Design a protein with these regions (language model features):
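Short helix-loop-beta junction
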Residues: 50-57, 270-282, 446, 511-518
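A glycine-rich helix N-cap at a beta->alpha junction
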Residues: 58-66, 108-119, 199-205, 473-486, ...
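Short beta-strand segments
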Residues: 89-90, 115-119, 172-178, 260-261, ...
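Short acidic, glycine/serine/threonine-rich loops at helix termini
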Residues: 47-50, 75-77, 98-102, 125-131, ...
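Thiamine diphosphate
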Residues: 1-150, 178, 248-253, 279, 417-549, 555-563, ...
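Flexible, low-complexity linker and terminal segments
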Residues: 2-21, 25, 31, 147-385, ...
Length: 636
């Protein structure tokens, strides 16, 4: 049986159960995309995982991780300028980083076409907010496709790539968390049989202008608007913009009811109609910008009441209300009225309740969901650092150096979890790379309270360097603790730029900091807790900018790598010497490794399936009750 790795490059068409991200990866390959770039971020990283599975000799494409989303977009755009079909993907908030370039790209002629894949995150499942990136399509004059299923993710990527090449422009493909991670039987087309064409085609004398000086901006913007208007004609006849009537169409309580929707809410509405049997039609939009105005006007004209059903912001609602006014529609437009409905994902349960509030004569809210009889509710579990994580060891050491009134600033990454007990480090968080700059601001006019910022090595390369340069140039009175685990761990252990793992140059942090003007710099292993505590105390006493690097490899990645190299590899969990343990619970209450289990009688044991035997906890027990068991044969 063929593996998914083999399926990705199978030249024949096939059908298989795959997740949405894998479907997109296959669509890239069989539609002839030549250059793909990314900065890792949920919910899209499995696209990268799939692309990286293909051996180099079988790839018809070049795939690279970039320093950040802006760089990733610009590399892909440069390839598209040169005539190579290109794509870039990143998470929702990554578009904030790339926005400077995204807004400008529609003004250019991108001969190869460019698909920009956005991993939006309604519900903020793995993001610091749930921003709605549909507004960027309006701001940048860009078409946007919105798949609702893995099959549509595959199909609409192919349509987006074809449209981007035809019009020589960027096209947005907006995925959401459910579409990325849902699995479905996906049918794919055969791969393009022609060999990759790497002929460079950029010619600054044709299809210009390419430089937006004042006299060129209007012609460039005019071209962007004309291209967008041509896409509106495509939207009117696109097969992905269609009316669905699972139960036919008939008046309900004397009114013809309709729904305009897209993406996950459209599928949720279909499920509700399937369960309830109401004869309500849905105009489902797969190409949601520009809106197919004629098709929507016709839909409004054939219904008495129409609900605009969408997640997050009132994007379609605002535009459809304007369209209804312009067209003189007599249909009553309904929309969300509860503030809570502007937050989170709209699954079947929430859509059913929303429909019941909108049309109580046609829908009932349904019974509340409950755990099956006899089954207890799941115990709430906060996210936490893995057993053996060097960040835990670092936080335990740093906390011993902090003063009671110290201000601590978090950043994005696994170390964000330090804000929870027992560490409680990281009192404010904005976005990637903000930590050192926000700490700089907090230090101004604040001589009595030391500000300590934290940043991971991947985030540092992504967006931390300008803040470090600023802090060094102004000699801000702050401490920066760099937690270096050598990878981009939180999103799946993608190769960190500058680590050397991707075959590129290795960029050591010490000379980088020195080049940025850092004068006070200390380094040690995060497991060397006494040394790290001493370094942080010294840094806090230093007047001005001080940097401490706490380095230890991600232990989850390390143990997985060891098991791949040697299937017989086994970890050796630590143990509790019950004769020494006085049940003061430092291991649980202060160090906080989830491998320690406190019993009802107060005793502590080690969970053998969780402990990886790293030993970072040995130095934390005041009575040395945490011990390494002897190996067979008596060796310790």
């Amino acid at each position: 049986m063929a593996t998914l790795k083999d399926r990705l490059v199978d030249p024949a068409g096939w059908s298989d159960l795959v997740m949405g991200n894998w479907a997109v990866a296959r669509a890239m390959i069989d539609s002839g995309t030549r250059v793909v770039t990314s900065y890792p971020g949920s919910p899209t990283p499995e696209i990268a995982s799939a692309l990286e599975l293909v051996p180099e000799e079988k790839r018809s494409y070049r795939f690279d991780f970039a320093a950040n989303e802006k760089v990733a977009l610009e590399v892909a755009a440069g390839a598209a300028l040169n005539g190579h079909p290109a794509a870039v993907f990143f998470k929702s908030v990554g578009l904030n980083v790339a926005a400077d370039s995204l807004i400008q790209l529609p003004l250019l002629h991108l001969a190869g076409g460019l698909v920009v894949i956005l991993g939006d995150d309604p519900g903020a499942n793995s993001s610091q907010n749930e921003q709605d990136n549909r507004v960027f399509a309006r701001m940048a004059y860009l078409p946007m496709f919105e798949p609702a299923t893995p099959q549509e993710a595959y199909d609409l990527y192919r349509e987006a790539a074809a449209l981007a090449r035809k019009l020589a422009m960027p096209v947005l493909l907006r995925l959401t968390t459910h579409v990325c991670h849902a699995r479905e039987l996906v049918t794919v087309q055969p791969c393009a049989s022609a060999p990759p064409d790497w002929t460079p085609r950029f010619d600054p004398t044709t299809h210009g202008p390419y430089v937006p000086i004042t006299r060129s901006v209007f012609p460039m913007k005019r071209r962007a608007l004309e291209r967008l208007e041509s896409v509106r004609e495509v939207a009117e006849s696109a097969g992905c913009n269609r009316v669905l009537a699972p139960n036919g169409a008939a008046p309900v309580a004397g009114k013809r009811l309709g729904i305009v929707s897209s993406a996950l809410p459209a599928m949720a509405a279909l499920e509700v109609l399937h369960d309830g049997g109401q004869p309500v039609e849905i105009l489902k939009l797969g190409l949601s910008h520009p809106l197919p105005r004629k098709k929507i006007a016709e839909f409004l004209a054939s219904h008495d009441e129409v609900l605009v059903l969408e997640e997050l912001d009132r994007v379609m609602e605002t535009e459809i209300k304007s369209l209804a006014w312009d067209s003189g529609s007599k249909a009553v437009l309904r929309a969300r009225t509860d503030r809570e409905e502007l937050m989170g994902e709209l699954g079947p349960q929430r859509v059913r309740a929303l429909l019941a509030r909108t049309w109580p004569e046609a829908f009932s809210p349904g019974p509340p969901t409950a755990a099956p009889a006899g089954e207890p509710d799941a115990v709430p579990r906060l996210p936490q650092m893995c057993p053996g994580c060097g960040h835990r060891s670092a936080f335990h050491a740093v906390k011993a150096a902090l003063e009671k009134d110290s201000i601590t600033v978090a950043d994005i990454g696994c170390h964000t979890l330090g804000f929870q007990a027992p560490y409680e480090i990281g009192q404010v968080l904005l976005c990637m790379g903000h930590g050192v700059s926000t700490a700089s601001g907090l230090s101004i006019g604040n001589p009595a309270r030391k500000v300590v910022a934290f940043i991971g090595d991947s985030t540092l390369m992504h967006a931390g360097l300008p803040g470090i340069l600023d802090a060094a140039a102004h000699d801000r009175d702050i401490v920066l603790v760099v937690l270096d685990n050598g990878t981009t761990a939180m999103t799946g252990h993608q190769k960190r730029l500058g680590s050397g793992e991707d075959g590129g140059a290795k960029v050591p942090l010490k000379p980088l900091f020195e080049a940025l003007g850092v004068k006070f710099l200390r380094e040690c292993d995060a497991y060397a807790q006494a040394q790290l505590t001493a370094h942080v105390k010294e840094a806090m006493a230093h007047p001005g900018f001080a940097v401490v690097v706490a380095r230890h490899p991600c232990m989850l990645k390390l143990t997985r790598d060891q098991k791949r190299k040697n299937p017989a590899y086994q970890t050796r969990p630590v143990a509790i010497d019950q004769g020494r343990c006085d049940q003061r619970h430092t291991c649980v209450a202060e160090f906080g490794c989830p491998s320690f289990v406190r019993g009802a009688d107060g005793s502590v044991t080690v969970h053998p399936d969780l402990c990886i035997g790293d030993g970072s906890c040995l130095q934390t027990c005041p009575v040395e009750a945490i011990v390494r068991p002897q190996r067979p044969g008596g060796a310790s």
